Curated annotation (Swiss-Prot):
Function, in words: IF-3 binds to the 30S ribosomal subunit and shifts the equilibrium between 70S ribosomes and their 50S and 30S subunits in favor of the free subunits, thus enhancing the availability of 30S subunits on which protein synthesis initiation begins.
Organism of origin: Corynebacterium efficiens (strain DSM 44549 / YS-314 / AJ 12310 / JCM 11189 / NBRC 100395)
Protein name per UniProt: Translation initiation factor IF-3
Keywords: Cytoplasm, Initiation factor, Protein biosynthesis
One Pfam family recorded for the sequence: IF3_C
GO terms of molecular function: ribosome binding; translation initiation factor activity
GO biological process, alphabetically ordered: ribosome disassembly
Length: 203
């Protein structure tokens, strides 16, 4: 390999030399949580990236493993389909831990999405309407989606326009807090619409 690398156990110091491989070439590389590491990498040579993103160049796999060992880190294959494969010296245990943490946080955020329901009658009076509207706003401010249900009875079922108008009015009145995700539609005797909370910064 071109140049030389100064290493101490547990401390990857600096690579001295030149390389035609761009220092930014490894940015944005996706590392699989099941990537091959250390002795599992069985190719004659690799393009090596240091722990701080420095480009070491193309080296023999034996040399790459030794550099990782001397730095008290792991050799991780980050681009197996490249020719030669790209490997990075890094703390693989720390990487897997952080990846697992991100996955758990993502699942937690998905599970926290709650759908509340608010029911209205098509001929609701103004006072009740304001109360229902306040409930919808409160749900949206807490980050919940709201399923708004218009309940028709008897002859009211022959006048779906009452439901459409009421839902349109409500959507306009809460537009500062939420956006319609599912437009008004008939659902048996009822009519439903789903409003989702606005993302932060979009109010």
């Amino acid at each position: 390999m071109n140049g030389f690398l100064v290493c101490q156990r547990g401390n990857f110091l600096k690579w001295y030399g030149t390389s035609s491989f761009s220092r930014t070439a490894n940015r944005g590389v996706h590392i699989s949580a099941e990537a091959r590491i250390n002795e599992r990498i069985r190719v004659p040579e690799v393009r090596l990236v240091g722990p701080n993103g420095e480009q070491v160049g193309i080296v023999r796999i034996e040399d790459a493993r030794k550099l990782a060992f001397d730095a008290d880190l792991d050799l991780v294959e980050v681009a197996p389909t490249a020719k030669p494969p790209v490997c990075k010296i890094m703390d693989y245990g720390k990487f897997k831990y952080e990846a697992a943490q991100k996955a758990r946080e993502s699942r937690k955020n998905q599970q926290q999405t709650v759908v509340k329901e608010q029911k209205l009658r098509p001929k609701i009076d103004d006072h009740d309407y304001e109360t229902k509207k306040s409930n919808v706003i409160r749900f949206l401010e807490k980050g919940s989606k709201v399923k708004v249900t218009i309940m028709f009875r008897g002859r009211e079922q022959a006048r779906p326009e009452l439901g459409y108008r009421l839902l349109e009015r409500l959507a306009n009145d809460v537009a500062e807090y939420g956006v319609v995700e599912t437009r008004a539609k008939q659902d048996g005797r009822n009519m439903t619409m789903v409003i989702g909370p606005l993302r932060k910064g979009k109010k």
